[in-house]
């Protein structure tokens, strides 16, 4: 397995893996709106500050990390918006290998840390905890569900 930096040019392969994982349990995200999916992938992979990695087993994309570089007063960070391993490859060490490779690569780039969000009720939560990630206790996720179009 090897780590490769991806770009917007890899959008079709990214979409296949991303939807193959996140439209199933436990996420069940509805990505049937192809325009919205394209825009989301472009948001994450098509910006000058985007940082996207793929984990390949031969020619097969089996892992994906989409995020961006954030310059912060404590140092430059890698913010991961989406991280996944192909469903049939989960539980076999690919995720641990992938995350370790990303950590080593960003360290070589001079980035100080990785920041990501996940839900507590999905298997990824325990995976991150076992991989030495800790909860930031003073942060809270807030969501405004008001209809801003009618304001």
Language-model features and meaning:
Residues 42-54:
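A short helix-loop-beta-strand connector motif used in the catalytic cores of GNAT acetyltransferases and
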Residues 99, 106-119:
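Conserved GNAT acetyl-CoA-binding A-motif
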Residues 1-16:
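A short beta-loop-alpha structural element at the N-terminal edge
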Residues 90, 115-125, 142-146:
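Conserved beta-strand-loop-alpha-helix junction that forms the acyl-donor binding cleft
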Residues 70-80, 90, 136-137:
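A conserved beta-turn-beta hairpin within the catalytic core of GNAT-like acetyltransferases
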Residues 85, 91-104, 130:
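Conserved acetyl-CoA-binding loop-helix of GNAT-fold acetyltransferases
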Residues 19-41:
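Conserved GNAT-fold acetyl-CoA-binding loop/helix
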Residues 52-54, 60-69, 79, 84:
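Conserved beta-strand in the GNAT
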